[in-house]
Each structure stands twice: as C-alpha cells, then as structure tokens.
Amino acid sequence: MAYSTSVIRRLAPSEKFFAETQTFTSITVLLDGTVDIDAMADAFDALLEAYPVYAGHLEPDSDGGFELVADDLLHPGLWVQFEGDPAPTDQLDQGVALIYLLVKPDSTPVEVTLFIHHSLADGTHMAGLLFELFARYTEVVTTGSAGPVSPNPAPEPIETVLEQRGIRKQQRSGLDRFIPAMFAYELPPKRVTTRSAAERPAAVPTTRCRLSKAETSSLVKYGRVNRLFVNNLISAAILLAEWQVRRTPHIPIPYVYNVNLRALVEPPVSATGCTLAIGVATYLAHITPQTTMVELARGIADMFQADLADGVVQQSLLHFNMQYEGAIPGLPDVVLSTNLGNAVAMSTPPGLEVVGVQSQFYRASSAVIDVYSFGVVGGELLIEHHVDAAETTIDLIRSLLRSVVSEHQH
C-alpha cells in the first residue's frame, strides 16, 4: 500500500552529518512518584500535534543528502517498558519517526525518556520540547486536558537563521587557532573503539558524575570570586584531567565547545525555532604542571569573549559541520564538550518530583565518539562523558572540581 508523502525541506549541511550517522539524542527524566501512562500518552499526542514535523521522517535524496518528509502514517506512539521487557530502543528509526517517548513506570526511580533525532534538535531545543511535554502532562493530570494546540512550522536550520540576520561567512572559522599544533608533534596512536558498524542506532556508553547541591553552590561562588562562570571552571577541569591521563605533557590540547546562539543574535531565536542554533568556540590549551584551574578557565573565557566580539563564534558553522567523531589530520585528539545549561524547575503534578536528569547518544557508526556534556539540574552539577573507547577521566574531573570547592570552603 502506498502512502502519500510531501517533502518539507532538504536537510542543511549543519544537519546532514547526524542523518548520515542516524544519531538520536535522549534525555531521561528520573522521577519520584507514579506516572499516569494514559495521561502521558495524551500529552505526547498533543506535543506531536503542536510540532508535527517530528512525526515525519528522513529519506535519502538523489544528491547524497536527506529530505525531511511528512506522511499520512500515524506516529507509533509512546513505548512502555516494564521490568524484564526487552528495550524498545532498537526500534529507533529515522525512516519512521524523528521523536520517540519511553516510559518505565516500575523502575526506581521512574524513568521518562524523550528521544529526538539530532539533525532536528540541539540540547536547548530538546529541553524546550521536554518542558512542554511535562507542562501538558501536568495539565492532563490536573485538569483532564492537555491544553490548546497550535501547530508550529518546521524549525529552520542555523544557515537560514544566520542569513536572515545578515550574519555571513568570515575568513576565520575558529579552527585556525589549531594550525600551530598541526603536524608539530609526534602524536600517540589515536583512540580506537571495539564497536562494529551498526545498521541501526545503538547507545553510546556514558559515564556520569555529580556534585551535590552544596558543592555546586560552592563552585558557583568560587567562580564569582574569580569572575568566572561555572562552565569555564568545568572546561578547565576537563582539560586538566585530559592532560593528566594523556601523559604527553608537551603536547597542547585542542578544545572545541558548543555555544547556544539563540540569545546572541538579533532578533533572538526561540528554543524550538531553530534545529541546531549553535556556534562553535575553540581554545588551544598549553598546560604545564604549574597551570591552575583558574588560570586555564580565564584563558578560555577571555578567548571566547574576543571571538564573540569579532563575530567568529556566530558564523563558525558556516565553515564546518558539528561532528562528534573523526580527527583533524596531524592534530592531537580534540576535546569536545557541550553545555546543557541550567535546568529550571520542570512542571510536574502533585506527587511527582524530578530527582535527576541524564542524556545519551544513539548512533549507527563505528567511528569513535568522544564528547563531554555538563549542566546544572535541580541545583546539582551533572557531568557526562559519552565515549565508546576506554573512559579514564570522569572521576578525575570530579576530584579536581571538589578540590577547588574544598579550597573555597576553607
């Protein structure tokens, strides 16, 4: 049987890589209480009505790219997984849908996981959808209705957002900062993975650590005393840990990190108005045994402000695509991170409380992925390391951050 389809648009260059690797990103909300499955299904249906593009799918086009396609098929709906059931994540399929929802009602704590295709959503976009899902769920539980629904158009790619605002490609990309380190050192072997090429998306192993609310608060205060944001300190801790485990003290470390552009362009962009509203900032870290976390964090912060003032960060994705795999020839292994931001209180009905949040990548590729993500959830700092090679740094990062917290407290 043939179903009618219509092409919404082609994927832009910034989005294409994640279609090639079939990458889905997930956010899992950990909950204390009971989730009403029927109410969550109603809220999810309302979310799909409000953002119908995610009920569509991707199809290869004739030019080696991908098209975003709408069809008349119903979305398969949410998954419910009870203890002992097989995981439904092997059904993630960009040729069927671009969003999925999984509820584990009898796990402790209860888990609700939203999966979205990474071509169509960065972390901020995903958080916007997740917060709306829980707002509608709260409405269903407390009033019996998910609230009014007005369909939203498909989000624009970053290329269109920049063009509409007169932001054009400059000479510099930001990666030019790494040129002095290219082919300048005898490099150790590149990290490898035992993963074989997969036809369907598979979970990338993820290691996590947290700081308590008190530790996170102390870290924020420590940053203020030193005129630094927490993300600068976390970036410095990640780089110091990488420097220690690499055992190549004379080789600088290239650092690449995402920057949310939504509030940095005029007019600003809404959370769900653009697929990947990110720029890329870079830093080449020259670390010695005498390098302090504050010194390194200030170097990162100062370089970012300079590149932002010059407009380099805003137009960076017009030079290259954001990728989580592969290596630049002749360059030491790049450290890549993404800042999940500070999650404000999510709407929940009485008797249901958010006790944690975590993220995961699912992808079909045999290349090494190595990316850090971090953010503040419920007042607690969460740091994640998504890597399908040996993980050696997460405990060290936590230890480094706790050491400055302890220093500040005393």
From Swiss-Prot:
Residue(s) at site: Structural role in the organization of the active site: 122
The record's GO molecular-function terms, alphabetically, read:
acyltransferase activity
Keyword field contains Acyltransferase: yes
Spell out the InterPro entries in the cross-references: CAT-like_dom_sf, PapA_C
Coiled coil: which residue ranges? none
Reaction equations catalysed: 2 a mycocerosyl-[mycocerosic acid synthase] + a phthiocerol = a dimycocerosyl phthiocerol + 2 holo-[mycocerosic acid synthase]; 2 a mycocerosyl-[mycocerosic acid synthase] + a phthiodiolone = a dimycocerosyl phthiodiolone + 2 holo-[mycocerosic acid synthase]; 2 a mycocerosyl-[mycocerosic acid synthase] + a phenolphthiocerol = a dimycocerosyl phenolphthiocerol + 2 holo-[mycocerosic acid synthase]
**One Pfam family from the record:** PapA_C
**What are the alphabetically sorted keywords of the record?**
Acyltransferase, Lipid biosynthesis, Lipid metabolism, Transferase
Q: What class of enzyme is it?
A: transferase
Q: How does it assemble?
A: Monomer. Interacts directly with the acyl carrier protein (ACP) domain of the mycocerosic acid synthase (mas) protein.
Q: What biological function has been recorded for the protein in this entry? A: Catalyzes diesterification of phthiocerol, phthiodiolone, and phenolphthiocerol with mycocerosic acids, the final step in the phthiocerol, phthiodiolone and phenolphthiocerol dimycocerosate esters (PDIM) synthesis. Can directly transfer the mycocerosate bound to the mycocerosic acid synthase (mas) onto the substrate alcohols.
Regarding protein family, the annotation reads: Belongs to the acyltransferase PapA5 family.
Domain comment text? Consists of two structural domains that are related to each other.
Query: Could you tell me what this protein is called?
Result: Phthiocerol/phthiodiolone dimycocerosyl transferase
